[in-house]
From Swiss-Prot:
<dbReference type="InterPro" id="IPR008823">
    <property type="entry name" value="RuvB_C"/>
</dbReference>
<comment type="similarity">
    <text>Belongs to the RuvB family.</text>
</comment>
<feature type="binding site">
    <location>
        <position position="318"/>
    </location>
    <ligand>
        <name>DNA</name>
    </ligand>
</feature>
<feature type="binding site">
    <location>
        <position position="65"/>
    </location>
    <ligand>
        <name>ATP</name>
    </ligand>
</feature>
<keyword id="KW-0547">Nucleotide-binding</keyword>
<dbReference type="InterPro" id="IPR004605">
    <property type="entry name" value="DNA_helicase_Holl-junc_RuvB"/>
</dbReference>
<dbReference type="GO" id="GO:0006310">
    <property type="term" value="P:DNA recombination"/>
</dbReference>
<dbReference type="InterPro" id="IPR036390">
    <property type="entry name" value="WH_DNA-bd_sf"/>
</dbReference>
<dbReference type="InterPro" id="IPR027417">
    <property type="entry name" value="P-loop_NTPase"/>
</dbReference>
<dbReference type="Pfam" id="PF05496">
    <property type="entry name" value="RuvB_N"/>
</dbReference>
<feature type="binding site">
    <location>
        <position position="184"/>
    </location>
    <ligand>
        <name>ATP</name>
    </ligand>
</feature>
<keyword id="KW-0963">Cytoplasm</keyword>
<protein>
    <recommendedName>
        <fullName>Holliday junction branch migration complex subunit RuvB</fullName>
        <ecNumber>3.6.4.-</ecNumber>
    </recommendedName>
</protein>
<feature type="binding site">
    <location>
        <position position="68"/>
    </location>
    <ligand>
        <name>ATP</name>
    </ligand>
</feature>
<feature type="binding site">
    <location>
        <position position="24"/>
    </location>
    <ligand>
        <name>ATP</name>
    </ligand>
</feature>
<keyword id="KW-0234">DNA repair</keyword>
<feature type="region of interest" description="Head domain (RuvB-H)">
    <location>
        <begin position="258"/>
        <end position="348"/>
    </location>
</feature>
Length: 348
């Protein structure tokens, strides 16, 4: 199973990038949720504009689908400048980065997604560009090679990553602003769904928007994807209007339950309960039992279930918590009762 194949996958898809562009907010006033980030960025941007300076280099990190690219575009829009976008894996050689840097206008934003995947040689070129707005380029080869310095206009680098821990210390230290995006509340997601529906010209009730939001795993990208699929259902079977009942029937048909779990999530939890008595079970045994790769369990399935308190990692293996039994309407084993060995999701 591949993450991108799942309806509730947080990772993006190429076609969605085009679709999301139409509903993406362009200003901080339209940016929903993340109140601390929004307030801080409004302050930093206003101060930079007041001094006629470029904004400090900004690092945005957090789980996929929370709006890192959206925030980068908002920064450029609020600063009144252009944004040039690329990603870490695309910048394979120093020349690739140099070409982008030399095409920037004063105060422009250079957005690098997946910045943790920059190659070391490209990262070395980025250091003086960020710090001194200079580009060191090697001309020629062998004994005749020489280094020349090119002055760059002041610019803002906005880096986005889902894995801030993989950034090297020298790169991380060069960002003057660091922002972490958190999962969204159901209320904020419902507002996002209603806004997207309005832009798309869809008739949606508040309860219909909330029904989609509460199954979107705290992630705007998933909420907007579910909205499109519920729209299909509403147009064919619901007279074009998205009510709570229509959203519920559509999402049940799509196999997304009230907690945002899909078939793969439920299969993992039920396998642990039915075949391994709730655990502890090693990840290799679990992978064999559900015919998945180990990394799929660790990188795709587990994170959300752990974050929601349905699975724990312990020194002896994975265990399900009492929440998993309650979700399926099963009797809770005595060891998972109040004060049991695994009753607290944060313990290991």
């Amino acid at each position: 199973m591949i993450e991108a194949d799942r309806l509730i996958a947080a990772s993006g898809r190429d076609r969605e990038e085009v679709q999301d562009r139409a509903i993406r907010p362009l200003s901080l006033d339209d940016y929903i949720g993340q109140p601390v980030v929004r307030e801080q960025m409004a302050l930093f941007i206003q101060a930079a504009r007041g001094r006629s300076e470029s904004l400090d280099h900004t690092l945005i990190f957090g789980p996929p689908g929370l709006g890192k690219t959206t925030l980068a575009n908002i920064i450029a829009h609020e600063m009144g400048v252009s944004v040039k976008s690329t990603s870490g894996p695309i910048l394979e050689r120093p020349g690739d980065l140099a070409a982008m840097l030399t095409n920037l206008e004063p105060h422009d934003v250079l957005f690098i997604d997946e910045i943790h995947r920059l190659s070391p040689v490209v990262e070395e070129v980025l250091y003086p560009a960020m710090e001194d707005f200079q580009l060191d380029i090697m001309i020629g080869e062998g004994p005749a090679a020489r280094s020349i310095k090119l002055d760059l206009p002041p610019f803002t680098l906005v880096g986005a990553t889902t894995r801030a821990g993989m950034l090297t210390n020298p790169l991380r230290d060069r960002f003057g602003i660091v922002q972490r995006l958190e999962f969204y509340s159901d209320k904020d997601l419902a507002t996002i769904v209603s806004r997207s529906a309005n832009i798309l010209g869809l008739a949606i009730e508040d309860l219909g928007a909330y029904e989609i939001a509460r199954r979107a795993r705290g992630t705007p990208r998933i909420a907007n994807r579910l909205l499109r699929r519920v729209r299909d259902y509403a147009e064919v079977r619901g007279k074009g209007q998205i009510t709570k009942a229509v959203a519920d029937m559509a999402l049940n048909l799509l196999d997304v339950d009230e907690r945002g779990f899909d078939h793969s999530d439920r299969r993992l939890l039920l396998t642990m309960i039915e075949k391994f008595d709730g655990g502890p079970v090693g990840v290799d045994n679990l992978a064999a039992a559900i015919s998945e790769e180990r990394h799929t369990i660790e990188d795709v399935l587990e994170p959300y279930l752990i974050q929601q308190g349905y699975i724990m990692r312990t020194p002896r293996g994975r265990v399900v918590t009492r929440h998993a039994y309650l979700h399926f309407g099963l009797n809770i084993p005595g060891r998972l009762g109040e004060g049991g060995d695994f009753s607290e999701p944060g313990d290991e």
